[in-house]
């Protein structure tokens, strides 16, 4: 029994690279270097994104005209899907050909 416990000790159960009790991968120097480079890029992005390009006064309403134009274009595109309005007078105008009293 002690021999079995001694021989089976320290073994990763099941597949050693997947699962809950998997074998941890060794971290190489290249992986550390890539992680440091990614963190530096993220820090620089955070630095630049923390400073606004426009002031609050400039930002207020700067896209109102563009949004209104886009809404009008959307409204026109939706209206283009429907047929044009037809009036009842135009629809029944052919009946006026034989009208004697006018």
From Swiss-Prot:
Any additional notes?
Identified only in the intact 55S subunit. It is unknown whether it belongs to the 28S or to the 39S subunit. May localize at the subunit interface and dissociate from the 55S mitoribosome during subunit separation.
| Record's protein name | Large ribosomal subunit protein mL63
Q: What organism is the protein native to?
A: Bos taurus
- According to its UniProt record, what is one Pfam family this protein matches? MRP-63
Record's subcellular location: Mitochondrion
What Gene Ontology cellular component terms go with this record?
A: mitochondrial inner membrane; mitochondrial large ribosomal subunit; mitochondrial ribosome
One GO MF term on file is: structural constituent of ribosome
Q: Which family does it belong to?
A: Belongs to the mitochondrion-specific ribosomal protein mL63 family.
Alphabetized, the UniProt keywords read: Mitochondrion, Ribonucleoprotein, Ribosomal protein
Gene Ontology BP annotations? mitochondrial translation
Q: Does the keyword Mitochondrion apply?
A: yes
Q: Which domain of life is it from?
A: Eukaryota
InterPro entries xrefs = Ribosomal_mL63
């Amino acid at each position: 029994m002690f021999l079995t416990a001694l021989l089976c000790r320290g073994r990763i159960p099941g597949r050693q690279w997947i699962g809950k009790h998997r074998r941890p991968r060794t971290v190489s120097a290249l992986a550390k270097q890539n992680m440091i480079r990614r963190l530096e890029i993220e820090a620089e992005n955070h630095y630049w994104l923390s400073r606004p390009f426009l002031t609050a006064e400039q930002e207020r309403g700067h896209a109102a005209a563009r949004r209104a134009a886009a809404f009008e274009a959307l409204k026109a595109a939706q209206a283009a899907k429907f047929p044009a309005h037809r009036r009842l007078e135009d629809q029944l105008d052919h009946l006026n050909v034989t009208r004697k009293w006018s």
